[in-house]
Amino acid sequence: MCILLKNGKIYDGTGADAFIGDILVDGERILDVGTGLATEADEVIDLDGLSISSGFFDAHSHNDWFAVKKEPLKYLEPFIRQGITSFITGNCGLSAVGFEPDSPYAEKAGAGLFGYHGDTTGVYPTVKEFFEAVDRNNPCNMAILVGHCTARTSVAGWENRPLTEEERKRMLAILEQGLQEGACGLSLGMMYLPGRFADVAETRDVALLAEKYDRPLTVHPRAESAVSLDYPIFGRAHILRALDELVEMSRGTHMKLQYSHAIFVGRSTFKCKEELHRILDEMKANGIDAQFDIYNELLGVSVITVFIPNWFQELSPKDKRKPWNQWRFTILGELSMKMLGFGWKDIQIAYLGPGLEQYEGKTVHQIAKEWGKSCMSAYLDLCEMSGFKGRVNMGPYSTPEIIAWQSKRDDVLYMTDAWVEEHGIQNPAIYDCFPKFIRCSLRGEGDTMPHTIRKMTGGVADRFSIPDRGYIRPGCFADLTVFDEAEMASAVPDQEKPFGIRRVFINGKEVLKDGVLDKEALKTSGHALRSR
């Protein structure tokens, strides 16, 4: 089918100024771009007053775990509605691919956060198998990183020990196979099991492998806060110690380092922002291709036990209630929150379990006040009510000023780091992340519009070596997002819907028009994105 989109304000993904022009789409690809294109087309769409760019490209996603569902649209619909057509998945070391099919630890892939649970189309140990599944049944385009946590789990489970030489070779072979099959890079999750057990020598092996194939290594650092459980409590801020570890890992290489979701967890961490970027800049000066990515929410999603140390979780219910353990837990918990710069008003219940929906959306402080008890006691009760498996939204992880400052840097990409939860309150980034970046740009609070668009289109495709994506030019695939700048600039933020996204095309198929999804087209509109 031939479609002519006329008179649109075109952002071509290069960072150049927008221009008024026409785009001719033939089948899956862009055939021509120019002004006054005179040609016969099956459909002519007048974009007068509207803007158009390549479909938005989420630079940091975990939607590989949801792309394998039998009905993936349920999980991807909110992203499509905010103009996203493509994803870089497999982040934080937690990829859905990268394990030996006969591994006794295969079910541990995902570190307990994700997994092949529920109604999936199958289990896909390799990148090749995952890509074949995406091409059969997916609404969106999916690139994937191979996760170190997944590969390490495959050969050694979650054991806290150095790998044997044989295990090391098997792990690296898994990662290399993924790169050879078109993975767009590798990923580390140094805060997750079993990535947290890897030393610098092990992560350096992974970095050198990514460098060999000229692909990025994305890194969830060991700490993103001023204090954590991973380093001695006093001295240099832990977020900076974690970055020091990456400096040591990359020393002497020319690797592509992608520092994931540059956040500053807790008010006590905000002061580290300049030093973090000074270190990244120093790495660049020493030959490391260092970049980072951000989302624009002030909160993050965490397990409800985020402030409960392992020793307390391992106690029996009876021992948890012993006065000495209660006192020790309370003192250490309050101290850690104070050192981080969190308060009980900052922790919102997102999900506890069936029949406990009345607590969703309330803060621990609110619930404690309703119950007439201390916040720490109420928090412990909430943990127990959820079986220590609840979920919270908490912050601050940043400020509007920090986000605006980071969003203007040349070495940043934009992303959501969000996924659809089965129950409870959702992360607002699934609804309104990329439109918010545009809204901030239009209001003078972010980068310029051409650069904003580049950081969510062509810049992402370039970084991860995805050919023929991210740009509006002849020969590129016709992933297109049409948006109304006037509506976006004046919109009142709504956490459950984006504003101003008028049309979305994925590989030449119009899948969203004025808020209505074409669910039939979306069954097979997406493609696997192989890196080259």
Please report, for each region that a protein language model flagged, where it lies by residue.
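Histidine-rich, glycine-flanked metal-binding segment
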Residues: 1-4, 10-55, 73, 490
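Divalent-metal coordination cores built from histidine and acidic residues
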Residues: 69-185, 214-215, 288
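Active-site neighborhoods of metal-dependent hydrolases
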Residues: 134, 139-165, 173-192, 233-236, ...
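C-terminal cap of metal-dependent C-N hydrolases
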Residues: 317-326, 330, 334, 404-411, ...
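Divalent metal-binding pocket/active-site signature
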Residues: 183-242
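Acidic, glycine-enriched loop/beta-strand segments at the rims
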Residues: 11-22, 390-397, 402-403, 448-453, ...
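Active-site mouth loops of central-metabolism enzymes
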Residues: 59-70, 156-169, 195-197, 232-237
